[in-house]
Amino acid sequence: MCGWPLLVLWALLPATAAGSPGRSYPHRVVLDPEGKYWLHWGRQGERLAFRLEVRTNGYVGFGFSPTGSMAAADIVVGGVAHGRPYLQDYFTNADRELEKDAQQDYHLDYAMENSTHTVIEFSRELHTCDVNDKSLTDSTVRVIWAYHHDDPGESGPKYHDLNRGTRSLRLLNPEKANVVSTVLPYFDLVNQNVPIPNKGTTYWCQMFKIPTFQEKHHVIKVEPIIERGHENLVHHILVYQCSSNFNDSVLDFGHECYHPNMPDAFLTCETVILAWGIGGEGFTYPPHVGLSLGMPLDPRYVLLEVHYDNPARRKGLIDSSGLRVFHTTDIRRYDAGVIEAGLWVSLFHTIPPGMPEFHSEGHCTLECLEEALGAEKPSGIHVFAVLLHAHLAGKGIRLRHFRKGEEMKLLAYDDDYDFNFQEFQYLREEQTILPGDNLITECRYNTKDRAVMTWGGLSTRNEMCLSYLLYYPRVNLTRCSSIPDIMEQLQFIGVKEIYRPVTTWPFIIKSPKQYRNLSFMDAMNKFKWTKKEGLSFNKLVLSLPVNVRCSKTDNAEWSIQGMTAIPPDIKRPYEAEPLVCEKAASPPLHGIFSLRLLTCALLLGSMLSSQGL
């Protein structure tokens, strides 16, 4: 039956056991707390290839879900039963009922089972044009996984019990050329014996001082250092640049982030300069760019923020994870810079309660970019990566780019944003920002479960709407943001007058009577918000004049700071090319041939196993 292909497989068996020939998987992550379920993946043109390695001799389930639950999910189930490989495309309805998909869009490439593990490799198109499949884009994806010790029977897969979970990942973040790190000097930003509380989520902050260098260095790569066994505990790591006006006393201890008693020094650490998220191998700068260290304007103090995810609420965990920063004196052509763009973090950023969808916009105005770039880099700067940032109510973020009233291609987007998964997105092509351009960070929120106003602020229950742009060459511009006018927001709820001069914060309402002597926060909460009122308020806020924030290093200001600007008149919005769906084609011949090889390989593996090989 197998003939000469069996001889080919015999020759290729050592390579095939490690994966199908010619396939590489630049990304990998362990999905379960016990290290039993590993996911590997990589992009191949308009397809995405996956490899699952799971400690089971039954079925392996994998899929994508809009919320991380089983409802309305796109699922594939595969394995090896009685020496034969199988892979089946399923979906679930809103009631979590599993149904076989009439359009089978997942293609099995390789399968293997031994006495302990099942390995399957498969691929699918990014956009299958199947209403029961999820399109795979640059946005965050909620991956769901499951396994069982039995293969499916005639009635389908058995219930997986507790052998299941979910994880947010960005599957299409393009990989960059690796840097050989073994010969590079490095320093570590690592926590020391942090006790992890037995609660679901903990954010731990620790300040560090960057080593003192006698000459300029470039950071060219950052890698995670995750304590062994904690691969599923450490969820993401952010590094913020802090004020340089400190002494080393701020380094004495760490503290829980966003806590009322955290050190005041933490509040000066506002700009994200490094980031890592679970599933990432680290961050590598482009070969012509590096993050400068050792010079007067470079970071001296930084804040390490580590998000610990402990859903099982395990007790007694002690962690010493962090980041390894590789640097070199072989200076690259350009210094990297970071610009924070979006909404200035303040109480003037307001979101009503009970809203299934509410939009906020933060403007990096043409006036700020005209002054800062016009003075420092008239030919423009080049963006190569972006980190999008909101808090728990955030559901989607887009960084839009305008030039002379025409919208350019999106700089970055995440339409399925997850606060618990943040990393820099590499741009597939660098994009140039010129003097006089506009940037808008557009955030979409959901406050259906909230009974009071949501305010801009540092707490995770407060909100932000920010983009961090990695670019070159570095200019003296660290923040390009805006604040909407608060008085016009208050006029919407009927406020007529406040007490002046303003001597208290939040300031106090004078009239009308129903708000008299209330703070503006209390007045906004007293207003009876309905969905209709919320939509009208949203329309108003997006049209308001904004106060320009245009900052240099260490909070120095460009002259445009504090001036009022009008949101841009968008004459021509960007229109992406529509996705054209055609009738699904038949599986390629090489796919059928591959499955024959798979069957032969499994028979051969069974023969070898029976002979003790």
UniProtKB/Swiss-Prot annotation:
Cysteine disulfide links: C205-C257, C242-C269, C364-C480, C368-C550, C443-C465
Domain DOMON positions: 35-148
Free-text description of this protein's post-translational modifications in UniProt: N-glycosylated.
InterPro entries noted in UniProt: Cu2_ascorb_mOase-like_C, Cu2_ascorb_mOase_N, Cu2_ascorb_mOase_N_sf, Cu2_monoox_C, DBH-like, DOH_DOMON, DOMON_domain, PHM/PNGase_F_dom_sf
The keyword Signal belongs to this UniProt entry's keyword annotation: yes
Membrane topology, from the record: Single-pass type I membrane protein
Tissue specificity: Broadly exprressed, with highest levels in salivary gland and ovary.
Glycosylation sites: N114, N247, N476, N517
Annotated cofactor note: Binds 2 copper ions per subunit.
Transmembrane segments: 588-608
Subcellular compartments: Endoplasmic reticulum membrane
Main location: endoplasmic reticulum
Active site residues per record: Y203, H389
Known cofactor(s): Cu(2+)
SMART domains: DoH
Gene Ontology molecular function: copper ion binding; dopamine beta-monooxygenase activity
Family: Belongs to the copper type II ascorbate-dependent monooxygenase family.
Full protein name: DBH-like monooxygenase protein 1
Name of encoding gene: Moxd1
